């Protein structure tokens, strides 16, 4: 009986361990090299990449200064409330989401 309980506990632990290995969110990551993002991140075709173990959200920041548009997309541990702001010619859009690849569009 003790062996059956030990085996059941081991199976449950193994299942939970394997499940946690595949639970990381995948996000589009680009534009992180520029202070305000990069132009190729706006329209580029990027594959979603696995984020860190603590990341729960994908983020997107779009900036338009009246002459060009740049973007930054990546992973985040916290939620970024959706925000659209305009100040003169400069407009920004920020948002986050929590499904794989959701920050692509």
Swiss-Prot record:
One of its GO terms (cellular component) is extracellular region. Residues 79-105 are annotated as: Disordered. InterPro entries: Snake_toxin-like_sf (IPR045860), Toxin/TOLIP (IPR035076). The scoloptoxin-05 family has remarkable similarities with the three-finger toxin family commonly found in snakes. Gene3D superfamilies: CD59. Residues 92-105 have a biased composition (Polar residues). Expressed by the venom gland. This is U-scoloptoxin(05)-Sa2a. It comes from the Eukaryota. Residues 1-24 form the signal peptide. It comes from Scolopendra alternans. It is found in: Secreted.
